Amino acid sequence: DCAVTERYGRCICCSRQQASVLSYHNGALREYLSEKLPEYMVPQNYHFMEQLPTLSNGKINRKQLREDFKEETAVIRFSKATTETEEKLLDIWKQLFGYENIGIEDNYFSLGGDSLIATRLISEVQKTFGCKITISTIFENLTVKSLAKAIEQSEQKEEDTLQIKPNLEEAYHPFPLTDVQYAYWLGRSGLYELGNVATHCYFELDADGLDTECAETAWNLLIQRHGMMRVIIQPDGMQRILENTPQYHIDVTDIRQLEVTEKEKALDEKRAEMSHQVIQTDEWPLFDVRITKIEDQKHRIHISFDNIIFDGWSMFHLLNEWAEVYRNGKAEMPITLSFRDYVLGLEQIKSTSAYEKDKKYWEDRVETFADAPDLPLAKNESQITEQRFCRRSAKLSQKEWQSVKDAAGRLEVTPSVLLMSAYAETLRLWSSNKDFTLNLTQFDRKQLHPEVNNLVGDFTTLTLLEIKNAGNNFAERTKAIQKQLTEDLEHTAYGAVELERELKKKTGNMRGAIMPVVFTSGLGVEQWNEGKWLGKLNYNISQTPQVWLDHQVVEMDGCLCLFWDSVDELFYPGMLDEMFRAYTGLLHTLAVHPEIMQEKTASLVTAEISEKRRQANETAAEFEEKTLDGLFLEAADKFPDKEALVTCSRRMTYREIKEEAFYISGQLKSMGIKKEETVAVFMEKGWEQVVAVYGILFAGAAYLPIDIHNPRERVEKILRDSGTRIILVQNQAYDQDTEWLHEWDCISVSG
């Protein structure tokens, strides 16, 4: 006898034990059914029973079946280890997957395996067996039995294996930023287009009956426990953990007496202020926590994190830990290992043979590397001076998400890759280039020490993933993505930030965003769990410099949360809404009808959306090729004596600006300025800025505006990184403690 039922979207085959069934284990039974059934109909789990529960009328009691079915993904009757290697490896799998009943025939992907678990598995195998395996080894040997054989046949070697030790004596000495941190730090400087914003994340939590004093005490205990909550970034680009910091005070605003509309206005104003903050990095703290008391028992917690020091896992971990400390009244002891120890350990990797091998792997592909998706833009990046990110969000229910994960398992790809493939499928409908590169954000903690997983910090790594429009159907394209990503993840010693520098050199796009379409997977890291937080999530948004669109996926309470954070000003009105509807619609369809993955003509969009996409891509038009300085000269010829500029110190006509700008142009040419060479404008706001910019353009050079209020070290960094040798200054600015500028050739603009 047999019954098939469903729990959270998983197909469960329940059978009364018979001789013909007892001889099967999970792997063999699945293999047999795979030969008889379409892939999407093969049950994911098998539950053997002595007797099927029935109702009084003799029919099968399906409700009781679901209650009897245990929440393990693995089967109850499983194949046990037969060798020492299998036994040790099985223990590792149980630890990583969190299941006790795992057999040596159980499938890695069916258990929920992904690339993050694979990374940890590689580390554990190296510790236990003293051999090096790769992600490809795991994905080609998806059972304990098969992987154990691969381990036994591998070479026992430990070259280039790094371990780190806590250095307590130098714990508060400066240390370098990681490559990703440094990219974030430069991105906020304004040196690049779509810069001038911090890498930032903002949360709002609604809490009932919050004790604000206890919340503040708990937050301060976390500050004592985690060194990176006491970090600053010095003007020279080094970071430093402070040994001691003042008691952090959480500002509490009481709006209980306000009318409903006034309360909403006050909360909106606070969100507008905090959701896109650019926190000063050379001053502590690099976070901002406030509380609004809305009613006697209702509070809203506002949390602003600078992601240059906290990655996604770290933020979720802090929110979990904050609530735990709040309820228990105490925090665990400070961690011996520090993020400084970890970063210095990463620096050692650059001197290994693995780094040189991975560098060659990536640099050999630079010349043929695919561009980012070429999406229709309403504006050029350079036209946006202050970008604001907007969020679109959707959710897959527990049942839908489990169904999608099961579909990924049957396809033998990770859930992240399946989501990434659906994202790419959507982008391809709007992008003019069908082969493109996505920028993947990952939280990769290299297991250099047992305490690494207890640290908070920015462990973010980036991977540039080329996605080809190859394959007859969605399933084939998804498996191709899995294959490419698997290969790429075996060459992570050389980072994507370094690769982007090489790509910028190839394209000549030194100031623009080169890979601005991002996919961020939070799967496999600490889940969003509102039950563990101080309050229920009310709102959340993130931003990153030089990013157009960032798609983030995270699990919360068994559901899948989907977020698109985007610079909407870049795109045509309504376009991103249509794209997001197409994407989420595909995922909902996949959850109900996973068989469409095999269809050659599967369509993601309705005819209406397809037509709008076609219209959005019709961007061909005739434009006059006019430049900023060319337009000015036209106006100066037409209206030479018309007033063009008014400041508090001077009024100027077009003729006067033109004459003074040509004078500056002549000075630059006499100094040997080259076409498209960068000339810095280092001034307070004033008429001199206008003259300086036109003077530079008339000379055929490019101008680089620098905020005069930036710290000296940052200005010097920008000047050196941009290759600038000439700076235009004002008399008053040049006289104010700027002797250090004498390293460069300076021209003073004065009336």
Regions found by a protein language model. Give the residues of each.
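Short Pro/Gly-enriched beta-strand edge/turn motifs at strand-loop
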Residues: 269-275, 374, 531-537
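Carrier-protein-dependent adenylate-forming modules in NRPS/ANL systems
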Residues: 1-66, 71-341, 360, 377, ...
